[in-house]
A protein has these predicted regions:
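Hydrophobic alpha-helical segments, chiefly the membrane-spanning helices
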Residues: 386-391
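Conserved N-terminal phosphate-binding loop of PLP-dependent enzymes in the Aspartate aminotransferase
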Residues: 2-376, 380, 384
Length: 391
């Protein structure tokens, strides 16, 4: 990296840009990577070097970089009607069309769609929806939010409190009332001799004990990712969601699927909640909704919840919440085209086609004598503890 070259892109970055979620010691020693463009699965830096972006722009770019159809849709909308809000009963026609499409694609009987600019904002919005609904229904004490250890739901004050990661202690979070149930990572947390189904049943019992300890009438809702992405791509143990669903319904606790990462094909289904049989009341979406070409988040409300929220909002004369760019027509046009690309170009089928081959080749790589690092589950008598950060 040209961190010592005067006026290099790297030096300019280090003087002007504050990077989040970045080891600043390593950044100062090695410098940043400054990117200029992308094409397909590759991104290119200022020196012309290309990289396979295996993380897909933080799970965003489901259609790859430089997809001409999506770019054309964005440009056409920019020429027609580049930006507007969804306040005061006004909205762009493209946003109405997108809402209809999301309702069509939803895995449940959907009511309406609410728009934000990110997954964090969408999850935060649902918290306020829950609080308003319970308060208006005479249950103002129902404010506690249940998530899980190693969960990731965002970076706002509320969603960082929901995120089950230790680093949020730097901000004095979580706030009171944000509870973290067990992480459904069977390999790491399963007991000796315990099957996956037994593990899932134990976690369900623990969840019910948590609810009873806190008081069922104090719980506003539970959020869960189909696969815990930032927590380590943790696939839920067999039978996990089937085990916890009846408990949530028993105590009338709304269940929210955070599909910010898993939604729109990442798991080989349009929704991760379908693949793992979550059956949520609300879906939160972002990222692949626009294939990474425009910031957007969406809350898809199940009809029963939506009807209840609309009723109390009418009583209050409004739902007093919103974002200036939420439901932006540019984002809506991009999302409509991105969803068409996912369907028309067979992205779901391709995920299912290549995933088995990818895993087979990954295992084969582990057998190669020059493989630098290959990991697989160690014997059950190992500690299964995390490697130290200094490793």
């Amino acid at each position: 990296m040209d961190t010592n070259v005067s006026n290099s892109w790297e030096q300019r970055d280090m003087q002007a840009v504050f990077h989040g979620f970045t080891d600043l010691g390593t950044l100062n020693a090695e410098g940043p990577v400054i990117l200029t463009h992308g094409d397909g699965i590759r991104v290119f830096d200022v020196h012309g070097k290309s990289y396979i972006d295996a993380n897909s722009g933080l799970w965003n770019n489901v259609a790859g970089f430089n997809h001409q159809g999506i770019i054309d849709a964005l440009c056409a909308q920019a020429r027609k009607f580049p930006g507007y809000h969804a306040f005061f009963g006004r909205v762009a026609d493209t946003t109405v069309a997108l809402s209809e499409k999301l309702i069509e694609l939803s895995p449940f009987d959907a009511g309406k769609v609410y728009y934000t600019n990110s997954g964090s904002e969408a999850n935060d919005t649902v918290v306020k929806m829950l609080w308003m609904l319970h308060r208006r229904n005479g249950q103002p004490q129902r404010r506690k939010i249940i998530t899980r250890v190693n969960a990731y739901h965002g970076v706002t004050v509320a969603t960082a409190s929901m995120t089950g990661k230790a680093y949020n202690a730097e901000f004095g979070l979580p706030l009171p009332g944000f509870l973290h149930a067990d992480c459904p990572h069977y390999w790491r947390f399963g007991l000796e001799g315990e099957t996956e189904l037994e593990f899932s049943a134990r976690l369900a019992r623990n969840l019910e004990e948590l609810i009873l300890k806190e008081g069922p009438d104090t719980i506003a809702g539970m959020f869960a990712e189909p696969v815990q992405g930032a927590g380590g791509v943790i696939v839920p143990a067999e039978g996990y969601f089937e085990a916890i669903r009846p408990i949530l319904r028993k105590y009338n606790i709304p269940f929210i699927a955070d599909e910010v990462i898993c939604g729109f094909g990442r798991t080989g289904e349009m929704w991760g909640s379908v693949k793992y049989d979550m059956q949520p009341d609300i879906i939160v979406a972002s990222k692949c909704i626009t294939a990474g070409y425009f910031p957007m988040g969406a809350v898809i409300l199940g009809k029963a919840f939506c009807d209840a929220l609309m009723k109390v909002s009418e009583e209050a004369e409004e739902f007093p919440h919103g974002f200036t760019a939420g439901g932006n027509p540019l984002g809506s046009a991009v999302a409509l085209k991105s969803l068409a690309v996912i369907e028309d170009e067979g992205l779901l089928g391709n995920v299912n086609k290549v995933s088995g081959r990818f895993m087979a080749r990954l295992k084969k790589l582990g057998e190669h004598k020059y493989c630098l690092l290959y990991t697989s589950p160690s014997p059950r008598d190992r500690t299964r503890s995390r490697m130290p950060s200094s490793a």
